[in-house]
Swiss-Prot record:
Keyword annotations: Antimicrobial, Disulfide bond, Fungicide, Plant defense, Pyrrolidone carboxylic acid, Secreted, Signal
N-terminal signal peptide: 1-29
SMART domains in UniProt: Knot1
Annotated function: Confers broad-spectrum resistance to pathogens. Has antifungal activity in vitro.
Subcellular localization(s) per the UniProt record: Secreted
InterPro entries, alphabetized: Defensin_plant, Scorpion_toxin-like, Scorpion_toxin-like_sf
A matching Pfam family: Gamma-thionin
Protein name per the record: Defensin-like protein 14
Length: 80
């Protein structure tokens, strides 16, 4: 009985050790800074169009319509 308990303990320890080394490595997310679009004119009412314009014309990672007093503006997100 003692021999089987030692084997089970060893297998459990080996499993924990294996899991510790095989855990996926988390990469730190890249921080994004926002900047009003330089190519958008007027009030922003379509976030998808804003996103496409920010990505295609300004080289941003993302874009969306955000409320910036006094109206909605197209905001582009770039790596900081």
């Amino acid at each position: 009985m003692a021999k089987s308990a030692a084997i089970i303990t060893f297998l459990f320890a080996a499993l924990v050790l294996f899991a510790a080394f095989e855990a996926p490595i988390m990469v730190e997310a890249q921080k994004l800074c926002e900047k009003p679009s330089g190519t958008w004119s007027g009030v922003c009412g379509n976030s998808n169009a804003c996103k496409n314009q920010c990505i295609n014309l300004e080289g941003a990672k993302h874009g969306s319509c955000n409320y910036v007093f006094p109206a909605h503006k197209c905001i582009c997100y770039f790596p900081c």
